[in-house]
Amino acid sequence: MGKVIRSLNRFGKKVGNALTSNTAKKIYSTIGKAADEFLESEIGSAAIDGLVQGSVHSIITGESYGESVKQAVLLNVLGSGEEIPDPLSPGERGIQAKLKELEDEQRNELVRLKYNDKIKEKFEKELEEVYNFYNGEANAEIEDEKQFDILNKAVTSYNKILTEEDLQNRRLATRLQKEIGERTHAETVMVKEYRDKIDALKNAIEVERDGMQEEAIQEIAGMTADVLEAASEEVPLIGAGMATAVATGRAIEGAYKLKKVINALSGIDLTHFTHYENRPSVVSTILEYRAKEIPDNALAVSVLIKERAIQENHKELMHIKNEILPRFKKAMDEEKEIMRDRRQMIHPKVMMKFKIPRAQQPQIHVYSAPWDSDDVFFFHCISHHHANDSFFLGFDLSIDLVHYEDLTAHAHAIGAAQTAAGRTLTEAYREFLNLAISKAFGTQMHTRRLVRSKTVHPIYLGSLHYDISFSDLRGNAQRIVYDDELQMHILRGPIHFQRRAILGALKFGCKVLGDRLDVPLFLRNA
């Protein structure tokens, strides 16, 4: 269990003390009169910005130029119309989630219509039975249907899809790591198809990057969702590599309504089984090698990162199948005996026993302090049920404070075995506010509001799904806490833009681009 409390870094934060510092005096005695006048005039007028601010800031404070302004790119590739929402705006997040759900349903239905026969041949007819049951339930209740059998078939079918996806990704990673001369013809074709997709993605990203303003946080956008879907899927389970409708694992699950049937029959919410993305790692690799060819080993690392997320979902499903369903069946039989009901239906009382509170779902949960809510907010990030892990990430942007802490797991109906380690969310939140209150940088009014906020529970503002593995999510959070350079890039602009940048860096990661500047040459020509 770890805990980190740090002060956030911003551009210009130390400029106020720069002229009187010992480091500044040393700099003044060495850089010459012209540069000295340049520094004083620019700082005095508060006109330092962009590269000028970054370069001069590094000189007058003695810090490395690595902390100066570069181009920061949030590592998500977006379809048209999608934006990172403000974490403190539930309405904004809700509309975006509903639009995405409608788009996914339309795309998944196209996959079912196009590949239905091939999918049934590969994954057997159980998928079709589950889908027919879903449609039957939508039209009229089929009371004599053996609902627990349908539930079992839905879980089994989902397990087959995840197993196949796991296998295909491991195959691709293995083939990418092989020497070119050692690959068979089939392996060479597979690697070439994947490289073609990466090249398409690379070209699109390069076009967007060329159009981006320097020294700005940006999301790389511009490709349609369908093309992105094809380009980001390493090995489609069924269908051509760059087809318009690709039969990915997520598309097959969505087309045959597996998660919806499992939720309708058992009350177990599997919406956290999102589309495990490798796009952040792929985009990071493409940006790193933008001027040269990407080596196969670097691509293999991206595939293995996605593999980690697939295995996380697979372990979760096996936890549901092996641990939860037997308990569910036992509770169902007990309820039928009490009710003296011989029908093959699952009683709603049984479902309610396996419902868990929304605030304990495996998602990123957003809270804010009751007062000064725009500046004081935090994320409670929860892992899959089988892992029973979570962490706290709190921000006070008015005094530039960040607090990270690993927390104890929640005890609920579908969690794994409990371990007595870590503190609760309430304890972490109160310590976070106590530390913010004790800081001397805040105004008197801000301190009063924090004291008032400490006496009540924080405001719950909803939750978001994350599309990467929990370990990668934790890695992104820790990078926000530790990486001063990253902090300086995401903490710029209007306050709502800073919150979006923080959420983007948490969900997707952030890569800082740009080459180091020749500082002596810069000052010589200033």
Curated annotation (Swiss-Prot):
Record function comment: VP5 protein is one of the two proteins (with VP2) which constitute the virus particle outer capsid. Acts as a membrane permeabilization protein that mediates release of viral particles from endosomal compartments into the cytoplasm. Permeabilization activity is probably negatively regulated by VP2 and is triggered by endosomal degradation of VP2 and exposure to low pH.
GO molecular function: structural molecule activity
Top-level taxon of the source organism: Viruses
Nucleus keyword on record: no
Pfam families: Orbi_VP5
Annotated segments matching region Involved in membrane permeabilization: 1-42
Record-level GO BP terms: symbiont entry into host cell via permeabilization of host membrane
Taxonomic classification: Viruses, Riboviria, Orthornavirae, Duplornaviricota, Resentoviricetes
Keyword Iron: no
Family, per entry: Belongs to the orbivirus VP5 family.
UniProt name for this protein: Outer capsid protein VP5
GO CC aspect terms: viral outer capsid
Keywords on record: Capsid protein, Outer capsid protein, Viral penetration into host cytoplasm, Viral penetration via permeabilization of host membrane, Virion, Virus entry into host cell
Compartments, record wording: Virion
